Regions:
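N-terminal "arm"/small-domain region of PLP-dependent enzymes with the aminotransferase-like
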Residues: 2-81
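Short beta-strand
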Residues: 48, 93, 321-325, 352-354
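PLP-dependent enzyme catalytic core of the Aspartate aminotransferase-like
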Residues: 2-4, 171-173, 347, 355-390
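PLP-dependent aminotransferase class I/II
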Residues: 238-315, 319-322
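Active-site phosphate-binding strand-loop segment of PLP-dependent enzymes
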Residues: 140-202, 224, 232
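Conserved active-site segment immediately N-terminal to the catalytic lysine
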Residues: 204-247, 267-269
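Phosphate-binding glycine-rich loop
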Residues: 75-117, 125-126, 130, 134-135
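Conserved PLP-binding catalytic core of the aspartate aminotransferase-like
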Residues: 305, 312-347, 364
């Protein structure tokens, strides 16, 4: 791998995860009911910035009654919409990416990776770590992609790109180099691209699609199926699994819809594990329309860029520390993170205290919410916490 490989943005490197499952569950964002009860503030009075979900949701029309009455069917229209959106032929709808995160370790153990070591970003979405460790895998932390030149044969590498919560984004060219090295060692690269939609030019989905199409063309030309080769990991596409989320960019977290992009053999194994009727009829209906509404997607990118830039300006003015993130969240590392989190909660503003407890992640608010956040950050209690340490 290129030793001079660099990040588009710089990741954080702090450690220290929550000590108990109860604490870890509490640390997840999106638990507004719990916060309302804890601070005795009604839910309607909170400004919830605890998630990385877009503040503008894709507009959902009235759903046909058949969506509710019939069992979910194989939906070719949804598949075609996903193939066009992600620019790859092999896609599998899932009830959110979390379901695949939880089942991936078991699937990998049946496909020649039972004794593999798993490389995980030291700072990142902790559900990945929970799943692999629960399945008994040995995990190794890394802080920078350059450290991955130490991987051994059959190792599994988990890349969160862009990273949640640091916002670190590796370029597609650099990830392609990493894939080459992992493939040469018969390993597996899993990329969580849940926050990739607004920076889709850096996604590996199109590269995966190119490789999968090449395999299909080769199979047709030789009249020999390539599926028998998958177990031996002879094609680079079989060394790559990509997880995508519909909930974040489209503001549809409650729909519970995601996609896995991978080779046919990986998708077959995951489909079997998911079982029948995995994705609800309403989710299929909404997902198909959201993925094909290209004009709305373009407008969403523009709006998110504007709102996220405005948030970054407010945070930069309030904090002495640099602000990093994506168009769906901004993160600030500060030693006062727990105290600032508590002070904001007392004012009915719910942000994400990161697992290492040395950073705060802010979801993107509307203009009115941003004004409330800005005003709160300028109050005396917050100003005392935000002053740089002398």
């Amino acid at each position: 791998m290129d030793k001079n490989m660099t990040l588009i943005t710089t990741p954080s490197t702090q450690t220290s995860a929550p000590n108990t499952l109860q604490e870890q569950a509490l640390m997840h964002g999106g638990q507004l009911s719990n916060m309302a009860q804890r601070y005795q503030i009604e839910e309607k009075d909170w400004l919830d910035l605890s998630t990385g979900i877009a503040p503008i949701a894709y507009p959902v029309s009235i759903l046909p009654s058949a969506c509710w009455q019939r069992l979910p069917q194989h939906n070719e229209r949804l598949l075609q919409a996903a193939r066009r959106y992600y620019q790859t032929p092999n896609v599998l709808p899932t009830p959110g990416s979390q379901s695949i995160i939880q089942m991936l370790p078991q699937i990998c153990s049946t496909r020649g990776f039972a004794r593999s070591k798993v490389w995980l970003p030291k700072v990142g979405y902790q559900e990945h770590r929970k799943a692999w460790q629960k399945a008994g895998y040995q995990t190794i932390d890394y802080t920078d992609i350059n450290e991955l030149d130490q991987i051994k044969p059959k190792d599994i590498v988990l890349l969160i790109n862009p990273n949640n919560p640091t916002g670190a984004l590796y370029s597609k060219e650099h990830v392609c180099q990493l894939l080459e090295e992992i493939h040469s060692k018969q390993g597996l690269l899993i990329i969580d691209e849940a926050f990739m939609d607004a920076t889709g030019q850096q996604s590996m989905a199109q590269e995966l699609g190119r490789r999968n199409r090449a395999i299909s063309n080769r199979a047709l030309s030789t009249e020999t199926s390539s599926s028998s080769d998958y177990g031996h990991n002879t094609d680079k596409s079989d060394a790559l699994i990509i997880l995508r989320s519909v909930g974040k960019f489209f503001g549809l977290a409650g729909v519970r819809l995601g996609f896995v992009l991978a080779s046919e053999s990986w998708l077959s194994a995951m489909s079997s594990s998911l079982g029948p009727w995995a994705v609800s009829g309403p989710a299929q209906f909404v997902g198909e329309r959201a993925l094909t509404d290209y004009r709305w997607q373009e407008e969403q990118c523009i709006v998110l860029t504007r709102l996220s830039s405005a948030l970054e300006t407010v945070l930069t003015q309030a904090f002495a520390q640099p602000v990093h993130g994506t168009s769906l969240f901004k993160t600030v590392r500060t030693p006062q993170a727990p105290a600032i989190f508590e002070a904001l909660c007392q004012q009915g503003i719910y942000v994400r205290l990161c697992d290492e407890k040395d950073a705060l992640r802010f979801g993107i608010p509307h203009e009115q919410g941003l004004k409330r956040l800005e005003d709160t950050l300028h109050t005396a209690p917050l100003q005392q916490l935000l002053l740089p340490c002398s």
